[in-house]
């Protein structure tokens, strides 16, 4: 009994949660305490039905766990019962997330917490409310404002952030002049850059899939993009990845992070990202009179009606005609 008292006093000095200290004083262990930490671990286990899914959900939850630890502290995250997590705790996490990510990103991240807690409530037959339900998030759902197009002036200013590295420059110019997704460019093979036809061939590779079937397409290249791609592909095998450092699982994410790090040295507005170059291409095509069907073919959206109507060879010329107005 004396030993338990001494241990209890020692733990109390370490500022452990009172319920843990009380268990030590009593000499009796209570039923397993369900905490935010165990909720997250159980959720990862529940969602990890394949190795790929396990890796993705683990990375997502780990980032979220770090945010929660920053707000709640390690002790609260690991030892405080889920029953003692309050609505104010949920609001505190929401406010922290909104200080560093967009409203819609915060919604997605808080959705993981809410779903994980719902899973724990069902699996452990807990009779408690989910305090992360129906959190008010100002600005959520305003998807049209989440990612704004970059202006021509901003694009010119951005050139300085990429021009000192041939890889970064080739990626930037291709994204700027094609409107392709970052993953589509990052996952190219050398042979996908057809300098004779002056186009990119966007197709699946061993290290990168495509978002949709309609993403499989050919896209005209600007003279500046051709020059940048020739420089970066020099001496490489046609079957080899054009950007070997990104020819791996989640390579597109790594590429995007590198490009975003450079972009943020010039532009700090969170609504402007590398994807804003894609929005810019879409807007400029529309503003120069490009028909919607041709714009969709260039960007890999919808059904590729251009190829069906004109034939694939002529479709490339049709797309180039409209893209040249954007490049001018």
What is each PLM-predicted segment?
Residues 192-199, 290-310:
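Short, polar N-cap/turn motifs at the start of nucleic acid-interacting alpha helices
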Residues 83-84, 126-129, 139-158, 209-223, ...:
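DNA breakage-rejoining catalytic core of tyrosine-based enzymes
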Residues 222-270:
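Active-site/catalytic core of tyrosine-dependent DNA strand-transfer enzymes
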Residues 149, 206-208, 299-328:
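Catalytic-site neighborhood detector that most strongly recognizes the C-terminal catalytic loop/helix
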Residues 103, 107-111, 126, 131-182, ...:
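Basic, Lys/Arg- and aromatic-enriched nucleic-acid-binding interface segment
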């Amino acid at each position: 009994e004396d030993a338990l008292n001494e241990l209890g006093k020692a733990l109390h000095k370490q500022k452990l949660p009172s319920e843990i200290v009380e268990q030590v004083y009593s000499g009796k262990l209570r039923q397993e305490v369900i905490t935010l930490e165990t909720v997250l671990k159980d959720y990862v286990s529940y969602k990890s039905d394949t190795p790929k899914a396990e890796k993705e959900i683990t990375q997502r939850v780990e980032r979220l766990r770090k945010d929660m630890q920053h707000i709640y502290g390690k002790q609260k995250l690991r030892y405080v019962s889920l029953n003692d997590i309050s609505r104010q705790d949920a609001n505190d996490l929401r406010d922290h997330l909104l200080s560093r990510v967009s409203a819609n990103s915060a919604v997605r991240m808080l959705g993981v917490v809410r779903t994980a807690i719902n899973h724990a409530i069902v699996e452990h037959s807990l009779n408690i409310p989910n305090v992360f339900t129906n959190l008010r998030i100002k600005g959520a759902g305003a998807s049209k404002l989440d990612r704004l197009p970059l202006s021509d002036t901003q694009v010119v200013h951005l050139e300085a952030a990429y021009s000192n590295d041939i890889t970064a420059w080739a990626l930037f110019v291709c994204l700027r002049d094609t409107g392709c997704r970052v993953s589509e460019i990052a996952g190219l093979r050398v042979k996908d850059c057809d300098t004779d036809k002056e186009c990119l061939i966007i197709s699946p590779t061993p290290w990168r899939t495509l978002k949709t079937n309609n993403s499989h397409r050919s896209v005209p290249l600007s003279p500046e993009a051709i020059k940048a791609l020739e420089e970066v592909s020099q001496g490489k095998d046609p079957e080899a990845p054009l950007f070997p450092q990104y020819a791996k699982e989640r390579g597109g994410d790594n590429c995007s992070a590198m490009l975003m790090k450079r972009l943020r040295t010039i532009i700090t507005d969170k609504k402007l990202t590398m994807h804003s170059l894609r929005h810019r291409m879409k807007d400029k095509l529309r503003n120069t009179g490009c028909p919607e069907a041709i714009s969709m073919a260039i960007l890999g959206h919808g059904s590729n009606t251009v190829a069906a109507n004109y034939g694939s060879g002529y479709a490339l010329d049709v797309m180039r005609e409209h893209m040249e107005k954007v490049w001018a």
